[in-house]
Amino acid sequence: MTIFPKTLMLLGSGELGKEVAIAGKRLGCKVIACDRYEEAPAMQVADLAIVLDMNNHNSLQKTIRDYKPDVVIPEIEALAVEALKDIEKEGINVIPNARATAITMNRDQIRNLAAEKLAIKTANYGYASNIEELKEVSKKVGFPLLVKPVMSSSGKGQSLIKDKNDLEKAWDLAIKEARGDSKQVIIEEYINFDLEITLLTIKQSNHQTIFCPPIGHEQKGGDYQCSWQPQKLSFDQLKEAKSIAKKVTNELGGIGLFGVEFFIRGEEVIFSELSPRPHDTGLVTLISQNLNEFELHLRAILGLPIPSIECVSPSASRVILSQESFAKVAYKGIEKALEIQNSKIMIFGKPNTKKGRRMGVSLAQGKTLEEARFKADKSAKCIQIFEAKEAQS
């Protein structure tokens, strides 16, 4: 039987980490929220906030050793993963495990694991370490294609390229936006898909793997814009998606919730990416499911039962993006947004913003997916983001 309270350390304290922290507090856990900047969203609901450079091996290792949490929960990719491997050897539980965290932060490693080791269908791809290699690989992959940094997150540094004339610009952007010292890009065939989905996959300590109903989503520049649930798939499509998700997560090992992304093209199910943590497209589960993805993640981590996962209503989400950069932020239109029946607004509480930064999300239920998506879109459009002093004048 699990003894509470547990101490959870979040590595990354953004909006997803905030919901993990809230789920943890509801179970009586102590939450330590870490990030590179003050007043990050999860810090606002945690017992303790720590600002540090999580890419610094010694700093990250010392922080974990000093506080000795029961569980370390990475929420972002930008981490000194070698430090996590050392900590894991000392008996501290890293979720899902240090190896999975390392593999999934690098597009080349997770792609090689899926396509080469596990023989899973993916887009055609190749790698380049300089502009000349990029030009050569592009000839083999064929246009249109995508150029992405091997290490980045939230679509940063991605370009859709239709011909060779834009390759140098794509290279420059990818290297500029790459995380860490990586100077490598992945070149991917552009899949003319019918649909993109996320299959939230939960690996439990009892060795069972369970799934949430599929989530449909749209991205722009590789970054989530809206999502909806449940997304209908054929019997064969869902069976294949579950089979692939289970195969990849079994290879990675560990416990917790994984966000596994797929392209759907006709009856084809094509593996895209994987995150070993709650997924941004899964924010819709805060209104669509009996247990949201953050609660499911923690139940799996802490060895707690998950009797069932049910979709309670057709539901949708739409991100609320800032159009400008502000040192301090204020909002208008929340009253208008909340006039929409069966809708919610979540403001993440980020202390400042820049153009295109995700500052909140609207959530809505409907009798149909179409109604839910319409309401979520309408609600999000109500929210205006201002510089704080301007909004308060």
Curated annotation (Swiss-Prot):
- What family name appears in the similarity comment? Belongs to the PurK/PurT family.
**Protein name per the record:** Formate-dependent phosphoribosylglycinamide formyltransferase
Matches recorded under SUPFAM superfamilies:
Glutathione synthetase ATP-binding domain-like (SSF56059), PreATP-grasp domain (SSF52440)
| UniProt: ATP binding residues | 107, 148, 153-158, 188-191, 196
Q: Where does N(1)-(5-phospho-beta-D-ribosyl)glycinamide bind?
A: 15-16, 75, 280, 350, 357-358
What are the UniProt keywords, alphabetically? ATP-binding, Ligase, Magnesium, Metal-binding, Nucleotide-binding, Purine biosynthesis
Q: Which GO terms describe its biological process?
A: 'de novo' IMP biosynthetic process
Cellular component annotations (GO), alphabetically ordered: cytosol
